[in-house]
C-alpha cells in the first residue's frame, strides 16, 4: 500500500495531477481491476509476456537487484503467458478462460455499480 501512496505523492508533488485526479484514476483503473482480480490475475489478463517485457527494464529502476523477476521470466520462457496461452499464474485451459473472462466482467460491473452508480 505504501508503494502506491509513495508514487501517488510523487505524481502530485511534481504537479502531474491533483490529489483528486490520482484518487479518481486509481479507483476507476488499477483499484477496480485489483479488487476484482488481484495482482496475479491482472498480470494473467494483461499477458505475462507484456509484463515480463516491462519487468526487464522497469524492475531495475524499482528494485536494488537491478534485474527483472526471475519467476516471471521463466514462466514466459515456458510459454505460460496468462489467459492468452491457457496458463499463467492460474489455469485457463479449456473453457476456463471464457469462464474467467465472464467472472471478471461480472465483478467489474458489480464493483462499478457499488462505487459509481448507487450514489444517493
Regions found by a protein language model. Name each.
Residues 13-14, 19-120:
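NAD(P)-dependent Rossmann-like dehydrogenase/reductase catalytic/cofactor-binding core
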Residues 1-5:
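Structural/interface elements that position substrates and couple domains in central-metabolism enzymes
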Residues 6-7, 70:
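Short Gly/charged-rich anion-binding patches and loops
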Amino acid at each position: 500500500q505504501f508503494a502506491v501512496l509513495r508514487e501517488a505523492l510523487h505524481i502530485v508533488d511534481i504537479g502531474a495531477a491533483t490529489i483528486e485526479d490520482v484518487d479518481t484514476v486509481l479507483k476507476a483503473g488499477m483499484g477496480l481491476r485489483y479488487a476484482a482480480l488481484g495482482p496475479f490475475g491482472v498480470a494473467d489478463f494483461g499477458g505475462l509476456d507484456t509484463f515480463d517485457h516491462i519487468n526487464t527494464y522497469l524492475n531495475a529502476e524499482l528494485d536494488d537487484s537491478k534485474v527483472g523477476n526471475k519467476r516471471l521470466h521463466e514462466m514466459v520462457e515456458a510459454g505460460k503467458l496468462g489467459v492468452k496461452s491457457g496458463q499463467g499464474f492460474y489455469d485457463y485451459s479449456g473453457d476456463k478462460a471464457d469462464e474467467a473472462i465472464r467472472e471478471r466482467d461480472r465483478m467489474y460491473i458489480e464493483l462499478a455499480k457499488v462505487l459509481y452508480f448507487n450514489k444517493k
